């Protein structure tokens, strides 16, 4: 239903292939891709192309989808490039996006039609846009809205009006990930998340990072 709503309302959508493996190349905050998956391992190639095919065949007729994404935070390699070849062969006119080309520039011209980053500062975005940019720029993930944050959103919005090559971004998250339960003491309905149910380990408030509460009320 969501994709049909986007079609009707004119909401722009990027359809992302179900792939994320950042734990295989980001270790304790450092980029160490010696064993990143899928990378260029031939045994993974068929699996990732199958996921790209599933993405394309499921959503290809939705007019709201402007571009395809090869996945999220999975570094780069020949297998990712093979996914891009798959989408290119479909010749449906949509662009292809992949953020992790930023970490391996050897693939930047073969796995993404866009220059795309996560959580880049406004001044870094502007620096790229002022230096003869080859590709449109998108922040595929930014404004992680946890606690008293998101005060810098206006700085990014100003860039949209200033630069034709800046195409905005995707906020993570839109909605808090929480559930409504009845408080045993007060009897009131309250929103709870990781750790509130004595579950260990838990993500705690890390799941409460949306720009609206889980019940869709404004913060």
Segments predicted by a language model, with ranges:
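Extended substrate-binding grooves/exosites of carbohydrate-active enzymes
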Residues: 1-219
């Amino acid at each position: 239903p969501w994709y049909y709503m986007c079609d009707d309302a004119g909401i722009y959508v990027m359809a992302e292939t179900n792939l994320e493996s950042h734990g295989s190349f980001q270790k304790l905050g450092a980029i160490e891709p010696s064993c990143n998956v899928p990378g260029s391992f031939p045994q993974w190639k068929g699996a990732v192309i199958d996921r790209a095919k599933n993405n394309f065949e499921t959503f290809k007729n939705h007019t709201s989808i402007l571009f395809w994404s090869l996945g999220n935070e999975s570094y780069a390699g020949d297998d990712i490039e093979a996914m891009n070849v798959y989408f290119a062969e479909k010749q449906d006119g949509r662009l292809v996006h992949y953020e992790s080309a930023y970490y391996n520039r050897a693939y930047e011209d073969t796995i993404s039609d866009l220059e795309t980053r996560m959580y880049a500062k406004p001044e870094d975005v502007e620096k790229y846009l002022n230096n003869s940019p080859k590709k449109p720029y998108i922040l595929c993930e930014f404004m992680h809205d946890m606690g008293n944050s998101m005060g810098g959103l206006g700085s990014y919005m100003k860039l949209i009006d200033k630069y034709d090559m800046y195409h905005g971004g995707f906020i993570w998250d839109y909605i808090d990930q929480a559930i409504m339960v009845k408080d045993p003491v007060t009897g009131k309905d309250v929103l709870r998340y990781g750790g509130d149910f004595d579950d260990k380990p838990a993500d705690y408030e890390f799941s409460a990072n949306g720009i609206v509460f889980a019940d869709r009320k404004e913060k």
